Amino acid sequence: MAAAGGARLLRAASAVLGGPAGRWLHHAGSRAGSSGLLRNRGPGGSAEASRSLSVSARARSSSEDKITVHFINRDGETLTTKGKVGDSLLDVVVENNLDIDGFGACEGTLACSTCHLIFEDHIYEKLDAITDEENDMLDLAYGLTDRSRLGCQICLTKSMDNMTVRVPETVADARQSIDVGKTS
């Protein structure tokens, strides 16, 4: 009974959060209800999360699951790095300390457009559907193309190995656009 309640709570939180965090919580909630990730503990019947680390989960961070990504910076320099399957492109830039000025100013909260990236056609076609929230932020980005997405919303998959993404020549922080609108 507590497992079902915990799963419902995780799914409800996923709807509120949206984006990658929401998708993760929804997935966790679905798994919690079906595989017993939440189990009753003690005489009071309180739910406590239990987690077992399988060999396959530990292997996720192995070099086999590392994806090579090439970023073409604003000045035309190519920055090549690796990221883990499931990491967002914002995570890849931050974790590898790539020198992309102002990238990810809002830390992936969909409050700016500084992680705006332009994708190759064959990669763009395989990306998950864009959300309304991401689309709203992209509307405020400079250099918008029909292959533009926000790096905080794109998670690496094996099919993206060796992809190249381009950082637009100019950057707009949507938070500044909103602030300017409020003061005038």
Curated annotation (Swiss-Prot):
Positions carrying Phosphoserine: 63, 177
Region (Disordered): 35-57
Keyword field: 2Fe-2S, Acetylation, Cholesterol metabolism, Electron transport, Iron, Iron-sulfur, Lipid metabolism, Metal-binding, Mitochondrion, Phosphoprotein, Steroid metabolism, Steroidogenesis, Sterol metabolism, Transit peptide, Transport
Composition skew (Low complexity), residue ranges: 46-57
GO cellular component: mitochondrial matrix; mitochondrion
Binding site for [2Fe-2S] cluster: 106, 112, 115, 152
Top-level taxon of the source organism: Eukaryota
Residues modified to N6-succinyllysine: 66, 158
A UniProt-annotated Pfam family: Fer2
Annotated InterPro entries: 2Fe-2S_ferredoxin-like_sf, 2Fe-2S_ferredoxin-type, Adrenodoxin-like, Adrenodoxin_Fe-S_BS, Beta-grasp_dom_sf
Boundaries of the annotated transit peptide in chain numbering: 1-60
Record-listed N6-acetyllysine modification sites: 66
Residue ranges of every copy of the 2Fe-2S ferredoxin-type domain listed in the record: 67-171
Distribution of this protein across tissues and organs: Highest levels in the adrenal gland (at protein level). Also detected in kidney and testis (at protein level).
Cofactor remark from the record: Binds 1 [2Fe-2S] cluster.
PANTHER family: ADRENODOXIN, MITOCHONDRIAL (PTHR23426:SF26), FERREDOXIN/ADRENODOXIN (PTHR23426)
Role noted for this protein: Essential for the synthesis of various steroid hormones. Participates in the reduction of mitochondrial cytochrome P450 for steroidogenesis. Transfers electrons from adrenodoxin reductase to CYP11A1, a cytochrome P450 that catalyzes cholesterol side-chain cleavage. Does not form a ternary complex with adrenodoxin reductase and CYP11A1 but shuttles between the two enzymes to transfer electrons.
Name of the featured protein: Adrenodoxin, mitochondrial
Organism: Homo sapiens (Human)
